[in-house]
């Protein structure tokens, strides 16, 4: 089974790379029925307009804001080995990035519109925010490669953890612990951290979708996390790839059939909709998704919680202060960090030796 691995500019104006294939020709093929099975691979850049910072953009990305936490390296925030010993940073970030704080953007609505038009084959999402589903994309057409917030369990005894207690933990930023007698293990949401296996069935689903796709749409991803980063490379060379992103990533742009739309994701997807004659319908679909999300938030009592939530930056500062008090002079914490860094270095050296 595949596992999640981490590998260690913003464009001022939207630009389209000049290849043989163009946006016009792609849209024409969709309109004439030549393209009927679009597979999408989406990353954090799809959700930036929803208020969720991506990870690697200098100055504004999540990793650029983590300095107060003094992590051994940015990805440690989402590494299972680090989480097992030091879960405080993760829950500080979770408090500021939980789905109750977010609403679908135009990009999420665009995916829902593709399905409505009958041309969406599947969505591989690296996001854990669930905004594709909130926008109306059918659950059976989405694979959350990095999991989601739908469930939670103890990492020690694997027992399920009450949803109401998890909501309280996220709201306060406190680490939740198992409620089973004599366990006291750390509780983790159903997200996939670095060092954990991807969802069961990923390999077979990837093979199935790439073998039947007639277009790959890559939106808002750095393609720096394997095995997701390999999806565009594994696509048959005759199938066009459309990149919607701030910058070029992977090897997209090297094939004559590639189309690279560089700039703001929402702006470009609106432009694609305009080329297809779907611009008014896209705005209508987006408006409907916002109404549904607001109603869902009210029904779950999330709207009040969202108003109470501090900013991401405030969550980070508070967590840093708490960690300094709790673990600043802990010899055990120092040994844990040294051991974790040793494991990380061993992984790097092993990869280099392959």
Swiss-Prot record:
Cofactor: Zn(2+)
Record-listed E.C. numbers: 2.3.1.286
Catalytic residues (positions): 146 (proton acceptor)
Keyword vocabulary terms for this entry: Metal-binding, NAD, Nucleus, Repressor, Transcription, Transcription regulation, Transferase, Zinc
SUPFAM superfamilies: DHS-like NAD/FAD-binding domain
Binding residue positions for NAD(+): 43-63, 126-129, 220-222, 245-247, 265
Reaction(s) the record says it catalyses: N(6)-acetyl-L-lysyl-[protein] + NAD(+) + H2O = 2''-O-acetyl-ADP-D-ribose + nicotinamide + L-lysyl-[protein]
Cofactor: how and how many bound: Binds 1 zinc ion per subunit.
Subcellular location: Nucleus
Residue span, Deacetylase sirtuin-type domain: 16-279
GO molecular function, one term: metal ion binding
GO BP: rDNA heterochromatin formation
Any Gene Ontology CC annotation: nucleus
Sequence similarity: Belongs to the sirtuin family. Class I subfamily.
Function in brief: NAD-dependent histone deacetylase, which could function in telomeric silencing, cell cycle progression and chromosome stability.
Protein name: NAD-dependent protein deacetylase hst2-2
Organism: Emericella nidulans (strain FGSC A4 / ATCC 38163 / CBS 112.46 / NRRL 194 / M139) (Aspergillus nidulans)
Lineage: Eukaryota, Fungi, Dikarya, Ascomycota, Pezizomycotina
């Amino acid at each position: 089974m595949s596992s999640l691995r981490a590998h260690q500019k913003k464009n001022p104006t939207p630009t389209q790379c000049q290849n043989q294939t163009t946006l016009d020709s792609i849209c024409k093929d969709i309109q004439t029925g030549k393209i009927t099975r679009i597979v999408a691979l989406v990353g954090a850049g799809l959700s930036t307009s929803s208020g969720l910072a991506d990870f690697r953009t200098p100055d504004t990305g999540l990793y650029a804001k983590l300095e107060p936490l003094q992590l051994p390296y940015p990805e440690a925030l989402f590494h299972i080995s680090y989480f097992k010993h030091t879960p405080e940073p993760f829950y500080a970030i979770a408090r500021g990035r939980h789905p109750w704080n977010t609403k679908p953007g135009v990009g999420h609505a665009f995916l829902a519109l593709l399905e409505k038009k009958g041309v969406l084959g599947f969505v591989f999402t690296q996001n854990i925010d669930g905004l594709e589903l909130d926008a109306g994309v059918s659950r059976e057409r989405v694979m959350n490669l990095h999991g989601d917030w739908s469930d939670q369990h103890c990492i020690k005894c694997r027992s399920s953890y009450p949803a109401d207690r998890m909501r309280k933990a996220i709201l306060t930023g406190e680490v939740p612990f198992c409620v089973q007698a004599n366990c006291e293990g750390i509780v983790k949401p159903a997200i996939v951290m670095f060092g954990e296996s991807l969802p069961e069935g990923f390999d077979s689903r990837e093979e199935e979708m790439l073998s039947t796709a007639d277009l790959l749409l890559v939106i808002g991803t750095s393609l720096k996390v394997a095995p997701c980063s390999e999806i565009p490379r594994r696509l048959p060379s005759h199938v066009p790839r459309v990149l919607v992103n701030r910058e070029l990533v992977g090897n997209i742009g090297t094939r004559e059939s590639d189309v690279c739309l560089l700039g703001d994701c929402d702006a470009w997807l609106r432009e694609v909709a305009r080329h297809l004659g779907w611009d008014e319908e896209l705005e209508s679909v987006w408006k409907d998704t916002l109404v549904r999300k607001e109603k869902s938030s009210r029904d779950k009592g999330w709207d009040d919680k969202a108003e109470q939530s501090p900013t991401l930056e405030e969550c980070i500062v508070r967590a840093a202060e708490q960690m300094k008090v709790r673990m600043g002079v802990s010899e055990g914490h120092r040994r844990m960090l040294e051991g974790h860094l040793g494991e990380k270095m061993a992984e790097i050296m092993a990869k280099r030796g392959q």
